[in-house]
């Protein structure tokens, strides 16, 4: 009989980005929580690129922050370069991104977990989940001991039956140099969960001292830089002050020689040599994948990103590969600035087990077993931010399950986390899932600037934001509404096309005026608080478009039964992405509703289809 060591409300398996947010959320809600890890020193490890955020991803980090999560605070404290992406486009598609000091990020997260009340770190491998009457009751570890629990969150990342590929070399592991987890796959087979194989990869790490930086383009950070957490100083803002010290990244490009080396050795890669059967991420392809799929492209952009302030390692973003190591050296040295580069760690691909997310409710609890939750790469997603967003929801709902309370659901119209979870649990995945703003039909509303306004109420209700924090948000919200009403009530005369017309000050925001313009040209006061000022301007600009978006979404729902002609030529439809065309040709949906439920078919694709069919203007 196994020895029962302890009893927990929630057990989290894994200490990556999903596991951290799940464990912290559950513990902060008052659940006695255990985090089981293979190595307590790698909690929060960045397996691939040393960065947080990106298109849509940065918005997710701010949503996690609004729910009381940790990722935003961690990157604000350990980031070494900060940028706002898509600044040439509207606010609705802008997102923050930051380079991280990888070692400091990991140390920060480990310290937070170690000091969190109700959270206990266990360096043991969970090899089995104990179930009675379709309800989780405990876990069993590789040491043969058992822990009782009411809920389990599985966040194994790439570690479940992970296999690393470098050329024709196959190495069992969850990350290069680290063991994989094996026992849990047997548990899932025993309970008839389908298991599929997905694949991802990472580039080599380069010795900074062997790079010729004079041959590279400099890519600096923004000034002022954006921050991720509303609670990082200065509190109540999404911006750092000007003058924050940052490091540079650099840009280089592949060459025809690079492409020749890759083509000559394609048969030696794990992917094209037939060793890897798992499906890789469409939007983060290996360099060999790019060369095959875009044969006419003369060069591919590469970002060289420092891995930290106290290391010589450089991450070459855009050069992941599973080529043999000797070919990797030749390939990297064919790139300007890298002619004499030395590789510290080789690039590799990794294949791992995934349970299809259609096995889950939108709460991230499995349909087969009560109290069993999944989050992160194990659900078929790719990316730290996607993992963390699922992790905080799974952790919250695991704690609520342990307390016998109703779960939470995040809706598509209130968060990108809600968009992601809805996509995963209703459409499933045929390849690793990555978030983009185009996946949301509500992107004019669920922006990076208003995450705290959208989700702070829920964060407070769950006990993950303090009363003081929520009070500040409500005060700012009242200020925003007060200024909006004021500007809507004030009218000014403006010359347009030779005519002078009267407009409300609010309407001017939709005509590319700023509040500073209003102050300078018409003498109106503007809000002193920087966040209030920014938010008033953005909300007034977007309000009419958000209403139009809402009406369009209502119309789209009514058009779901529209028939699609069997002989339709998807190549002739303007506005469809390559992925959308491929998926529509493959699945041949007979109605627009069926098309909308295919993995990878975005609301934008459905709109383009309906316009082509003459159902929308």
UniProtKB/Swiss-Prot annotation:
GO terms for biological process: tRNA methylation; tRNA wobble uridine modification. NAD(+) binds at residues 280-294. Its main location: cytoplasm. InterPro entries: FAD/NAD-bd_sf, GIDA_C_N, MnmG, MnmG-rel, MnmG-rel_CS, MnmG_C, MnmG_C_subdom, MnmG_C_subdom_sf. GO terms for molecular function: flavin adenine dinucleotide binding. FAD binds at residues 14-19, 126, 181, 377. It is found in: Cytoplasm. Keywords: Cytoplasm, FAD, Flavoprotein, NAD, tRNA processing. GO terms for cellular component: cytosol. The keyword Metal-binding does not apply. Homodimer. Heterotetramer of two MnmE and two MnmG subunits. NAD-binding protein involved in the addition of a carboxymethylaminomethyl (cmnm) group at the wobble position (U34) of certain tRNAs, forming tRNA-cmnm(5)s(2)U34. NCBIfam families: mnmG_gidA. This is tRNA uridine 5-carboxymethylaminomethyl modification enzyme MnmG.
